[in-house]
Each structure stands twice: as C-alpha cells, then as structure tokens.
C-alpha cells in the first residue's frame, strides 16, 4: 500500500504548463465581474427551485446566485460549500446542461437558461483568489481516525466531513497526486490539473 497523502501544497509542486493553457483554453471561459452580476440578475429566484432539485448535491442555487447579484461573493461561496465541498471542480466539470441548467424554468419560455455552472465557478474562483480558509471550523478532536482507500473526490469530501466531526482522515492512493478522476481523468480544457490541485490544497 502506498504512503498516505500528506497535507502539502500540491498546487505549488505541479504548476500548469503554459503550453497546456494555450492548447486547451477553457471550454466555458470565466465570467467577468460585470457579466456575472448581469447574469445573476436574470435569475427568477424560484421558490421551488427545480435547478436545486436537479443538483445531485442539492446546492441552494437561487441563494448563491442572489448573493452574486448583491456582490456578496464570500456568502455565495459559503452557500455552495455548505452543500458541496468540491464546488470549484464541479462548477467546471459537472454536466450542467442535463442537471441544474437543464431544469431551469426559462426553458419553458424559450429563453437561454441561467448559466449556473459559470456563476458557480465565478463565486468559487473569487473565493480561492481571496486566500480565505474554508468557512468551517474543524470539530473537537475525538482521537479517532479513519483510513480512506483512494484519494478521489468521494474520499476528499468524506475526509472534509470527518474533519468537521473531529475525526482524523488518512488517505491512501496508488498514484502520487490526490484527486482521482478530477486530477487524472478530466480533459484539461474542462478542469485544468492545477485547478484540481488548488482545490485539494485548500481542503
């Protein structure tokens, strides 16, 4: 069995090569601050929110978008992270066209659905750029520990929840870097390696 993945700055160890960035530009480019506010204000903030119901992690979509509209980016990111600790990578890799955006009520009126994925990415990118720590305190140490086999998204999310419960998590993986599919299996133009590792570094 390989050594446990220790807490380290993987983002600094493996920078994104410039040639990769040139060859594989973003499939869905990041929104500017102005474009994000304009897009957020298109949202109807539905009470029953079919977009949130279609989200596998049940992010409160209207709430995080409303906070973008009011330029409360920290609050928006917190709303996302409360439901999905891997909200940054999901904002880039999630098939939103068949999930949240596919459920947007604007389809009923032959309108372009709200770009939920890009708005989520905007909020999470702003959160990462701020250098703020995760908005959750670790739980009181219980003295317990759990071994997680594989350091993919499921194990990372589990480790974060365990830490909030005061339980130490040790991740084991056959590969040198954590992240599983996020790090090794998603095309660079959707989820760059450096972005996956930056999110893991934050965790």
Predicted regions, residues:
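N-terminal Rossmann-like FAD-binding beta1-loop-alpha1 element of flavoenzymes
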Residues: 145-170
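Glycine-rich FAD pyrophosphate-binding loop
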Residues: 167-183
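Ferredoxin-type iron-sulfur electron-transfer modules and their immediate structural context
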Residues: 1-145
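N-terminal glycine-rich dinucleotide-binding loop that anchors FAD/FMN and/or NAD(P) in oxidoreductases
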Residues: 114, 185-203
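Residue-level detector of alpha-helix initiation sites
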Residues: 85, 152-153, 177
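Feature captures the FAD/FMN-dependent oxidoreductase FAD-binding
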Residues: 140, 145-149, 197-202
